[in-house]
């Protein structure tokens, strides 16, 4: 007796379902399945649940100029900026760092490059593309790094290479 098409279709569907169950067991171990889907970047929190917000560390307020680690690195913000208004209507940073106010405030003036447009034309005011300071400049906090860092600045590399221009003797 020859099996009908409906029996063949039913067997194919059963085979697909069994394969899907086997794949689920392989890719989603029992603990992950028990609490829902898990994403490695979120830690143990299931995707459907809201993770606990990370701890906010206090911002340093040292007012010191930090060494820059690479060419063209923007300087860091050495003081607290909590509560500063920085929007299209007002830039609190410019209250102290505008070139016209630095004699009075003793703050470091904004670089002349911040007054240039993308074609290097000098403007009377800060360029709109440089207006939002925290796009490049960030306050610092004394925290443990989330991941390891083995960055070495170019001066250290040059000192290591024997015979290199400027290498230590």
Swiss-Prot record:
GO MF term list: metal ion binding
Keyword flag Transmembrane helix: no
Family the UniProt entry places it in: Belongs to the NapB family.
Function: Electron transfer subunit of the periplasmic nitrate reductase complex NapAB. Receives electrons from the membrane-anchored tetraheme c-type NapC protein and transfers these to NapA subunit, thus allowing electron flow between membrane and periplasm. Essential for periplasmic nitrate reduction with nitrate as the terminal electron acceptor.
Listed GO biological process terms: anaerobic respiration
Name listed for the protein in its UniProt record: Periplasmic nitrate reductase, electron transfer subunit
Organism of derivation: Cupriavidus necator (strain ATCC 17699 / DSM 428 / KCTC 22496 / NCIMB 10442 / H16 / Stanier 337) (Ralstonia eutropha)
Entries under PROSITE patterns matching the protein: MULTIHEME_CYTC
Induction: Expressed independently of nitrate induction and anaerobiosis.
Pfam families noted in UniProt: NapB
Keyword flag Transferase: no
Residues where heme c 1 binds: 79, 93, 96-97
Annotated localization: Periplasm
UniProt KW keywords: Electron transport, Heme, Iron, Metal-binding, Periplasm, Plasmid, Signal, Transport
Gene3D superfamilies: Flavocytochrome C3, Chain A (1.10.1130.10)
Known partners and oligomeric status: Component of the periplasmic nitrate reductase NapAB complex composed of NapA and NapB.
Record's comment on post-translational modification: Binds 2 heme C groups per subunit.
Ligand binding (heme c 2): 114, 133, 136-137
Residues making up the signal peptide according to the UniProt record: 1-35
Entry's Gene Ontology cellular component terms: periplasmic space
């Amino acid at each position: 007796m020859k099996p009908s098409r409906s029996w063949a279709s039913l067997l194919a569907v059963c085979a697909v379902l069994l394969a899907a169950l086997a794949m689920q067991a392989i890719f989603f171990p029992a603990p992950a399945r028990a609490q829902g889907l898990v994403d490695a970047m979120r830690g143990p929190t299931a995707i459907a649940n809201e993770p606990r917000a990370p701890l906010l560390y206090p911002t340093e307020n040292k007012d010191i100029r930090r060494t820059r680690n690479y060419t063209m690195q923007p300087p860091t913000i050495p003081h607290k900026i909590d509560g500063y208004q920085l929007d299209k209507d007002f830039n609190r940073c410019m209250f102290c760092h505008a070139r016209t106010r630095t004699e009075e405030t003793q703050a470091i003036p904004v670089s002349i490059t911040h007054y240039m447009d993308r074609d290097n034309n000098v403007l009377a005011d800060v360029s709109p593309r440089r207006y939002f300071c925290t796009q490049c400049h960030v306050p610092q906090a004394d925290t443990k790094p989330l991941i390891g860092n083995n960055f070495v600045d170019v001066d250290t590399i040059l000192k290591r290479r024997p015979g290199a221009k400027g290498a230590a003797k």
